[in-house]
Amino acid sequence: MNYTGYLLAFQLCIILGSSSCYCQADLFKEKYKLRNIFNASDSDVADGGLFLDILKNWKEESDKKIIQSQIVSVYFKIFDNLKDNQIIQKSMATIKEDLIAKFFNSSSSKLNDFPQKLIRTPVNDLKVQRKAVNELFKVMNXDLSPKSNLRKRKRSQSTFHGRRASI
């Protein structure tokens, strides 16, 4: 890469970095705006956490991601409940956009999996029950868990380590 290419790459990094700083500043501003509107720093909300107490019990990173996505879904329910409040609409939209990007990789299909597909599963429907029982062993089996892939990877690596090339 020549000098001009390095200069253009550097400028691109500066532009991208400054735009993300601007977005973070805007996000903090909207959070504090909501905090002030709801008087969320008052002593009546200081009697214990709502979600943080739950989150403290989850230690593993993958477990935390699961519970955080559940908590984010609750925030979205709260935002939907307040959607008619014009004063906080921009703040909620900004925060919701950031949450979708962070926890659902900006994927609307992932966002809708939990609240629309899982929670609203008609558990009294016989066909649903039959499908659930049919999939039960696949869900519980190591086929879908990350640990099974790790075991397979370790197993395949150990077979390669056991073989030595003869000269």
UniProtKB/Swiss-Prot annotation:
Q: Name one GO molecular function term.
A: type II interferon receptor binding
Which top-level group of life is the source organism from?
Eukaryota
Identify the GO cellular component terms for this protein: extracellular space
- Look up the record and give one Gene Ontology term from the biological process aspect: humoral immune response
| Residues carrying covalently attached carbohydrate according to the record | 39, 105
| Family listed | Belongs to the type II (or gamma) interferon family.
- Record's subunit section: Homodimer. Interacts with IFNGR1 (via extracellular domain); this interaction promotes IFNGR1 dimerization.
Please describe what this protein does: Type II interferon produced by immune cells such as T-cells and NK cells that plays crucial roles in antimicrobial, antiviral, and antitumor responses by activating effector immune cells and enhancing antigen presentation. Primarily signals through the JAK-STAT pathway after interaction with its receptor IFNGR1 to affect gene regulation. Upon IFNG binding, IFNGR1 intracellular domain opens out to allow association of downstream signaling components JAK2, JAK1 and STAT1, leading to STAT1 activation, nuclear translocation and transcription of IFNG-regulated genes.
UniProt-recorded name of the protein: Interferon gamma
Q: Which organism is it from?
A: Dasypus novemcinctus (Nine-banded armadillo)
Q: What is the lineage of its organism?
A: Eukaryota, Metazoa, Chordata, Craniata, Vertebrata
